[in-house]
């Protein structure tokens, strides 16, 4: 591959991006009352937003439906050809149909228009032709027209699909803001994602409890405490007083500091080398908050206590890493 070919590829990419940027700039200038009306209709809908589209518009429609659904507007995609063969039963009079068609004359969508009207379903269109059958049948049409496709043959849907996608994103975010949709709301629709884990996962979901919680009593020999730490594998142990309440915590770091001071591990009890009380958290706080406490205090483990200061669990950095909080 020679330098000339490289330059041709770069020029092609720049031309495509430039044309699509211009199409989006033109869309930006057209946003007005029709967009406001579309948002109002979508907010007023008592059911779901049903997105329909054929071909490339269908692919874009699936993404728009997914974005709406994940940002507080219940939505799903229906293939218009399948709608003509039974899937129309998925749509109710309380729903709002968002129909995508660059030409506005897609046969499979036009076929559905009489039924949509008969059922009294709200119809919003997104087309590149405001004089098309679809645009005229809709309560509001969002102009998704473009001056030119990025394809040099002006055939492959490129600029038009970009504009449609951007317009769909604009609708989704406008509705998100109107609904007061929060990061916590977003997390509930993305429980498997990183944000969902940070905003939903609690300490109680990852902490070690019961037999998995390393614990010794005040007066236990240091060697005994080390054996408990080794058995439980958390790099720490909780130290309890005679009432079962937290007296302290002993960690790998405490052991290193004790050895640096020349302490004979065979001659001391845990009381002499533990960190008194130590940092604690409650089980109901977010795991992300526990992580911040660890980072702020440069510690690798936390004891989880109840309202009576009794240890009920423990967790360390590795637990948070495995849970995907870090």
From Swiss-Prot:
Influence of temperature on activity: Specific activity decreases significantly at 5 degrees Celsius compared to specific activity at 37 degrees Celsius.
E.C. numbers: 5.3.1.13
Phenotype for residue 190 to A: 400-fold reduction in catalytic activity compared to the wild-type
Disruption phenotype: Cells are not viable.
Family: Belongs to the SIS family. GutQ/KpsF subfamily.
Entry binding sites for substrate: 72-73, 79, 85, 111-120, 145-147
Pfam families in UniProt: CBS, SIS
Lineage of producing organism: Bacteria, Pseudomonadati, Pseudomonadota, Gammaproteobacteria, Pseudomonadales
Pathway listed: Carbohydrate biosynthesis; 3-deoxy-D-manno-octulosonate biosynthesis; 3-deoxy-D-manno-octulosonate from D-ribulose 5-phosphate: step 1/3; Bacterial outer membrane biogenesis; lipopolysaccharide biosynthesis
Quaternary structure and partners: Homotetramer.
SMART domains in the record: CBS (SM00116)
Designated gene of the protein: kdsD
Organism: Pseudomonas aeruginosa (strain ATCC 15692 / DSM 22644 / CIP 104116 / JCM 14847 / LMG 12228 / 1C / PRS 101 / PAO1)
Cytoplasm in keyword set: no
InterPro entries referenced in this protein's UniProt entry, alphabetically: CBS_dom (IPR000644), CBS_dom_sf (IPR046342), GutQ/KpsF_isomerases (IPR050986), KdsD/KpsF-type (IPR004800), SIS_dom (IPR001347), SIS_dom_sf (IPR046348), SIS_Kpsf (IPR035474)
Marked site: Catalytically relevant: 56, 108, 149, 190
Reaction(s) catalysed by this chain's protein: D-arabinose 5-phosphate = D-ribulose 5-phosphate
GO molecular function, one term: arabinose-5-phosphate isomerase activity
Keywords attached to this entry: Carbohydrate metabolism, CBS domain, Isomerase, Lipopolysaccharide biosynthesis, Metal-binding, Repeat, Zinc
GO process annotations (BP): lipopolysaccharide biosynthetic process
Task of the protein: Involved in the biosynthesis of 3-deoxy-D-manno-octulosonate (KDO), a unique 8-carbon sugar component of lipopolysaccharides (LPSs). Catalyzes the reversible aldol-ketol isomerization between D-ribulose 5-phosphate (Ru5P) and D-arabinose 5-phosphate (A5P).
Gene3D superfamilies given in the database record: CBS-domain, Glucose-6-phosphate isomerase like protein, domain 1
Tagged with keyword Zinc: yes
Top EC group: isomerase
Positions that bind Zn(2+): 79
Domain SIS residues, every copy: 38-181
PANTHER family assigned: ARABINOSE 5-PHOSPHATE ISOMERASE KDSD, PTHR42745
Domain CBS stretches: 207-265, 274-326
Name the record gives this protein: Arabinose 5-phosphate isomerase KdsD
């Amino acid at each position: 591959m020679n330098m000339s070919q490289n330059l041709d590829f770069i020029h092609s990419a720049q031309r495509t991006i430039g044309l699509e940027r211009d199409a989006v700039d033109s869309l930006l200038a057209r946003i007005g009352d029709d967009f406001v009306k579309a948002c109002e209709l979508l907010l007023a809908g008592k059911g779901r937003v049903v997105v329909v589209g054929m071909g490339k518009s269908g692919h874009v429609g699936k993404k728009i439906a997914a974005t709406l659904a994940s940002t507080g507007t219940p939505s799903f995609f229906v293939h218009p050809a399948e709608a003509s063969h039974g899937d129309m039963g998925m749509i109710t009079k309380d729903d709002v149909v968002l129909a995508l068609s660059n030409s506005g004359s897609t046969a499979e969508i036009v076929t559905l228009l009489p039924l949509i009207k008969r059922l009294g379903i709200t119809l919003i269109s997104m087309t590149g032709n405001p004089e098309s059958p679809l645009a005229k049948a809709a309560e509001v049409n969002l102009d998704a027209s473009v001056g030119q496709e990025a394809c040099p043959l002006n055939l492959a849907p490129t600029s038009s699909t970009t504009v449609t996608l951007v317009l769909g994103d604009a609708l989704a975010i406008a509705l998100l803001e109107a609904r007061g949709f929060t990061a916590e709301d977003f997390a509930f629709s993305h429980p498997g994602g990183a944000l969902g884990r940070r905003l939903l996962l609690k300490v109680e979901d990852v902490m070690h409890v019961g037999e998995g919680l390393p614990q010794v009593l005040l007066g236990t020999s240091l060697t005994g405490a080390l054996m408990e730490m080794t058995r439980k594998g958390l790099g720490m142990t909780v130290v309890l007083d005679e009432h079962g309440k937290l007296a302290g915590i002993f960690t790998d770091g405490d052991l290193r500091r004790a050895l640096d001071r020349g302490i004979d591990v065979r001659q001391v009890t845990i009381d002499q080398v533990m960190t008194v009380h130590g940092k604690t958290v409650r089980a109901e706080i977010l795991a992300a908050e526990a992580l911040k406490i660890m980072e702020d205090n440069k510690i690798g483990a936390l004891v989880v206590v109840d309202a009576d200061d009794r240890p009920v669990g423990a967790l360390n950095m590795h637990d948070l890493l495995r849970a995907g909080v870090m």
